[in-house]
Amino acid sequence: MTENIDTANIDAIKNKTLKRTANRANKEVFFRRRKGCPLSAPDGTAPIITYKDPDLLSKFISECGRVLPARVTNVCRSKQRELTKAIKIARELALLPFVYHQ
């Protein structure tokens, strides 16, 4: 009653299941729920975005001097616009540098 089973076929099936589970893991990481906006706390403890606070604004600027995108900083759309405007004003008033030289 024992049948002769091809081991190459079993290996192919194992590889398919491994790929399938790896794809699921990748999707779970990709579709992971984002944390809330750090600048929009519901209890009112969120910092106020203003050009007068270069310490807060510098957290959202890269080493090169560019404004970090919202997908990196997890900031909501409206706060990202406020940040961008405040950073541009702070640059014009020489509170923040336009470019960081290394």
From Swiss-Prot:
This is Small ribosomal subunit protein bS18. It comes from the Bacteria. The keyword Ribonucleoprotein applies. Gene3D superfamilies: Ribosomal protein S18 (4.10.640.10). Keywords: Ribonucleoprotein, Ribosomal protein, RNA-binding, rRNA-binding. Binds as a heterodimer with protein bS6 to the central domain of the 16S rRNA, where it helps stabilize the platform of the 30S subunit. NCBIfam families: S18. Belongs to the bacterial ribosomal protein bS18 family. GO terms for cellular component: cytosolic small ribosomal subunit. Part of the 30S ribosomal subunit. Forms a tight heterodimer with protein bS6. GO terms for molecular function: small ribosomal subunit rRNA binding; structural constituent of ribosome. One of its GO terms (biological process) is translation. InterPro entries: Ribosomal_bS18 (IPR001648), Ribosomal_bS18_sf (IPR036870). HAMAP family: Ribosomal_bS18.
